[in-house]
Each structure stands twice: as C-alpha cells, then as structure tokens.
Amino acid sequence: SKCWVNGYTVERFGKPGATLLNKGHRPFMQQKEFKDALAFAGDVVVIHLGVNDTDPRDWPNYRDFFIADYRALIDSFRVANPECRILIARLTPIADRHPRFESGTRDWHDEIQLAIETIAKYAQVQLIDFHAPLYPYPFMLPDAVHPDKEGAAVLAKTVYEA
C-alpha cells in the first residue's frame, strides 16, 4: 500500500511472518518484498524486524547470526541508495498473554532488543523506539503481537517525529 506524506512516497514492504535471520523459518531477505524494497531505493528506510525471530525454531538455534544478518540487510539498502537515511526500530512489545510468552519468547525478545541497540551503534543508523510508545497499551496489540490501526498510528507518529 502506498501513500504520500510531506512530499515523500511511503510504501510498505513488510512480509507477514518474516524473520531477520537468514536461517530463520521465513527470511525477509529471501522474500519478494525485500527485492521490491531494494528496487524502490527509498530516501528513508525504516526497518522493524526481529519479532518473528523469537520463534523457538529461530532464536535458540541461530541467534549468533542476528547482528551479521542485520548488518547485511542495512548494507543492502545502502547499496541500493547510498544517500538513504536508515532508521531501525526497537521491537514492538509482545503482550504477556502471548502463548509462548513465558516459554522463552519474553527473554528472546529482550535479547533481540539489546542486539538491535548494538546494531544501531555500530552500523551508524538511527535507533527509534517502537516498544515504549506501545508498552502501556496492550489493548493496541489485539493478538498480543501485531498493533491495531490505533497502534499503527502510534508507530507512524514515532517515525514521523524521528
């Protein structure tokens, strides 16, 4: 879906269930949406990946690749548009009613948050926070993971103000 904001064409290239990890169960970098995002060559790139990596098929087995895979993703966008501004987001919250919340997901989510903060520092990209603005409002995550329209508006505002 495409829209225009302050002279920018805004396009979404998300893939439901996609992982940042290239060895994950649905690697984003192997999806059509990734190729489309590179072809779009945006002036501003917002990356919010990692929530699906909390899957027990992924993080416990491949966590050691997360930072390198994220750096490769960032570098891909820099090749597509060397002048692009890249923002990477701290993960949206996972509500405690999520079925795997206490069986590893909560801890893995925290580990991924720390990895994203490390990546922002070393890849010299801007870190934005998708966690704090939604954390007080679990009702904006009706399935415990994905924001509803109101939650999406909060995230859009976060990006706009960055």
Indicate residue ranges for each PLM-predicted region.
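Solvent-exposed loop/turn segments at secondary-structure junctions
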Residues: 15-21, 51-56, 92-96, 132-136, ...
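Alpha-helical scaffolding segments of alpha/beta enzyme cores, especially the outer helices
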Residues: 65-68, 72-79, 111-118
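Substrate-gating cap/lid alpha-helix
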Residues: 93-130, 153
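Helix C-cap/helix->beta junction micro-motif
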Residues: 6, 80-82, 122-123
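Conserved SGNH/GDSL esterase-like catalytic core that processes O-acyl groups on lipids
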Residues: 1-71, 110
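Active-site segments of SGNH/GDSL-like serine hydrolases
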Residues: 48-54, 74-110
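Proline-centered loop/turn at the N-terminus of a beta-strand
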Residues: 9, 84-87, 126
